[in-house]
């Protein structure tokens, strides 16, 4: 009898021990619900922040930015710049391997920068690297990069998430298909990419930082509908969600299992107007449209207060000495109608308004803007695009074939400095498909000021040049600047170390599930 009790006790103890072991070794799998799909897993060929953010699962750069957008070393240990501003010498960390076993060294850096700076490769991010004359591997841990001309923002180019280090072995093996076969030095490696549904990454056992990563897997799942994204958090289907529907922020805040985060951003939302096409070639029309939009009302209707009306073309938090603020456009539909009449459009006109995203917040902005424009006689046919449509119809077409007229989108300067907040959007050479000047704006003075600002390291001179460029842009109004967003994300309280960067990218290297 005693033996029977003893055996049953052992069985019970065994079951309990097994359960405890099961709990102790339960897989740490995290699902992240994001607002749109991914275009590619090749960061050098992606124009959208989300694709580059997900690519950080696999890839790392020489340098990066911390939460305060300050420079930090990643795969590099240090750098020096020659007195003439032409040569950058970078010292690399030792003992790091790519996920395919290839050594990370100066030869690997050269392979990546040679690829990025070669126009024959037709990479979307070529413009970041076109000033590189040559890259040399001096020894295994020393790289020398020589520029064609002084470029004071170059170290910030190496900070940009596009400047990821890809295994040269993988580059040679996969060629143009590298976007489907990512191989980097990052904490995770690709498990599955279902292009219509999700990207799943798994822990890279050979990661060079001890004790990391702490998660076993991350599944990045595009969910266009804001409400569905929030619901996934509440049901436990997702552990992190961004962006959070602003109107649901208060509700989520009350959930004891969820933590809501609202943080500052460098994401500016705006509507560009194609100034090469009628009626947007007329400055009075562009001025009228700026008067036609009630920005404080837009902040309430579409962003539930989690944004501020834009007061310039560069968000104030980017390179504060260079970002200029102006008197906000007042809402004045009467003035808008007067200007339209002066421009030869007393009865308004018809046009198209496209959006670079199709999530619920973008839909609200489109509807609000459509109604506002209608009040001054402008009939706008709206289209909310997914990532594939945007890449094909906006990013992939030049001025002559482009159907862009009015285009609602956003930009965050992921280099953390002023040039990348201005040149890709306003320089004449950066019309699509080169970069993202979707207004097809061109002004020689602006081009000259932006170019001169990159040739000086004098902060006072930079301030003068960037101010002069912004003054002209603000006066000529190729945009309707709308708002600077606050970033609202939410996560399960048992998820730590996972947060949103000011440029809307993700930081998750230290993420853990308790």
Curated annotation (Swiss-Prot):
Function: Part of the ABC transporter complex GsiABCD involved in glutathione import. Binds glutathione.
InterPro entries: Peptide/Ni-bd, SBP_5, SBP_5_CS, SBP_5_dom
Keywords, in A-Z order: Periplasm, Signal, Transport
Signal peptide from the UniProt entry: 1-26
GO molecular function, one term: peptide transmembrane transporter activity
Family membership noted in the UniProt record: Belongs to the bacterial solute-binding protein 5 family.
Organism: Shigella flexneri serotype 5b (strain 8401)
Chief location: periplasm
Entry-linked CDD domains: PBP2_Ylib_like
Subunit structure: The complex is composed of two ATP-binding proteins (GsiA), two transmembrane proteins (GsiC and GsiD) and a solute-binding protein (GsiB).
Protein's UniProt name: Glutathione-binding protein GsiB
GO BP: any one term: dipeptide transport
GO cellular component: ATP-binding cassette (ABC) transporter complex; outer membrane-bounded periplasmic space
Keyword Transport in record: yes
Subcellular location: Periplasm
């Amino acid at each position: 009898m005693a033996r029977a009790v003893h055996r049953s006790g052992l069985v019970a103890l065994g079951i309990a021990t097994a359960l405890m072991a099961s709990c102790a070794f339960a897989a740490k799998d995290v699902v992240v619900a994001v607002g749109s799909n991914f275009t590619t897993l090749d960061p050098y060929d992606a124009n959208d922040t989300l694709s580059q953010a997900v690519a950080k699962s696999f890839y790392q750069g020489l340098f990066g930015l911390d939460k305060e957008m300050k420079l930090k070393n990643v795969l590099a240990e240090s750098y020096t710049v020659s007195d003439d501003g032409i040569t950058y010498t970078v010292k690399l960390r030792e003992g790091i391997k790519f996920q395919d076993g290839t050594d990370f060294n100066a030869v690997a850096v050269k392979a990546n920068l040679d690829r990025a700076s070669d126009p024959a490769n037709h990479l979307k991010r070529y413009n970041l690297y076109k000033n590189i004359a040559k890259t040399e591997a001096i020894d295994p841990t020393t790289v020398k990069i020589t520029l064609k001309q002084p470029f004071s923002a170059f170290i910030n180019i190496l900070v940009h998430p596009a400047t990821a280090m890809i295994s040269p072995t993988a580059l040679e093996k996969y060629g143009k298909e590298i976007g489907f076969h990512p191989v980097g030095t990052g904490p995770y490696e690709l498990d599955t990419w279902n292009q219509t549904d999700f990207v799943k990454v798994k822990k890279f056992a050979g990661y060079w930082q001890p004790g990391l990563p702490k998660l076993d897997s991350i599944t990045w799942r595009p969910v266009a509908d804001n409400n569905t994204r929030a619901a996934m958090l509440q049901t436990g289907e997702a552990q992190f969600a961004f962006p959070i529907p602003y109107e649901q922020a208060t509700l989520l805040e009350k959930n004891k299992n969820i933590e809501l985060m609202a943080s500052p951003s460098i994401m500016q939302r705006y509507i560009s107007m194609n100034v090469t096409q009628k009626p947007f070639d007329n400055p009075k029309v562009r001025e009228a449209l700026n008067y036609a939009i009630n920005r404080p009302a837009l902040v309430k209707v579409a962003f539930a207060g989690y944004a501020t009306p834009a007061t310039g073309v560069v968000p104030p938090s980017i390179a504060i000495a260079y970002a200029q603020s102006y008197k906000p456009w007042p809402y004045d539909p009467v003035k808008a109608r007067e200007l339209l009449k002066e421009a030869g459009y007393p009865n308004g006109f018809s046009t198209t308004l496209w959006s670079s995203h199709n999530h619920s917040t973008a839909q609200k902005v489109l509807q609000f803007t459509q109604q506002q424009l209608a009040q001054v006689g402008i009939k706008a046919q709206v289209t909310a695009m997914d990532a594939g449509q945007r890449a094909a119809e906006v990013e992939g077409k030049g001025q002559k074939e482009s159907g862009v007229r009015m285009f609602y989108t956003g930009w965050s300067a992921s280099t953390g400095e002023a040039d990348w907040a201005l040149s890709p959007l306003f320089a004449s050479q950066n019309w699509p498909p080169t970069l993202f000047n979707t207004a097809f704006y061109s002004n020689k003075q602006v081009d000259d000021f932006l170019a001169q600002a990159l040739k000086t390291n004098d902060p006072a001179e930079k301030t003068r040049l960037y101010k002069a460029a912004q003054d002209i842009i603000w006066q000529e109004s190729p945009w309707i600047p709308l708002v600077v967003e606050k970033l609202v994300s939410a996560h399960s309280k048992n998820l730590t170390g996972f947060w949103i960067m000011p440029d809307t990218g993700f930081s998750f290297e230290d993420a853990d599930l308790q």
